[in-house]
């Protein structure tokens, strides 16, 4: 199954009814994303061996919240949605969509917001980014989108990604139209921008019991049925792992067919779970999965592979 975004003027009444049954796509609600993430990171840091890094990530998330309101984005995406729909491509495809200077403005604002909070190596990193030319920043952005992690050091990547993510999330929140589920390509990548998921969440509320993958870039969530590998769509060799017990709020789903795994967070076990924060706070589970021979099928926006990883 694949998901396409249909312009509002092309949605017939039957399509509107279908879209209302199980929403294939949940566009980002930016009013709550970054504050909630920062709060969750700080909460998890209190009893986590990686507490210092979680608090560092919380500073970035809080800065994203501040910059979001300091630099709102106005953009008409109607024509872009129609063009992408005709081409069968994600409307905000990271490999196709031209980037304007807005994302670099966001980056410099993030740096200005974070500078008073940073010291030591972290301060040196953002000062280095502050001096980078526009061309150098664009090259780093392209390298991250191409998964060329040898070009962007793992200490610079979270800051670059934080600005890119904020830019793409702003655009995603402005998309007009609805999404429709169709038969076709697999759903391992975000239908809005084509980036990877960070984790998946089994939700409560109006989407009770449904699993949504959470994009690590534009913050969109897309529906993927449970008990099916989100990477290869097989279901015959799936296993679930946790560090606590069967009632754990954070588990991994491993697939013997493709050899990958993805975290699954259960809101009914803990309503506070957050796609990025709880994934980052459970790296011990990642280490266990690597010991078992599985490769991660996602990337956390605060933890990028270093060169050679």
Curated annotation (Swiss-Prot):
Which keywords appear in this protein's UniProt record, sorted alphabetically?
Cytoplasm
Q: Chief location of this protein?
A: cytoplasm
Gene3D superfamilies recorded: FdhE-like domain
InterPro entries linked: FdhE-like_sf, FdhE_C, FdhE_central, FdhE_N, Formate_DH_accessory
**What are the BP-aspect GO terms?**
protein maturation
Q: Name one GO molecular function term.
A: ferric iron binding
| Keyword Cytoplasm in annotation | yes
Tell me, in a sentence or two, what this protein's role is: Necessary for formate dehydrogenase activity.
PANTHER family per record: PROTEIN FDHE
Q: Which family is this sequence assigned to?
A: Belongs to the FdhE family.
Name the record gives this protein: Protein FdhE
Task: Tell me the organism.
Answer: Salmonella arizonae (strain ATCC BAA-731 / CDC346-86 / RSK2980)
Gene this protein is translated from: fdhE
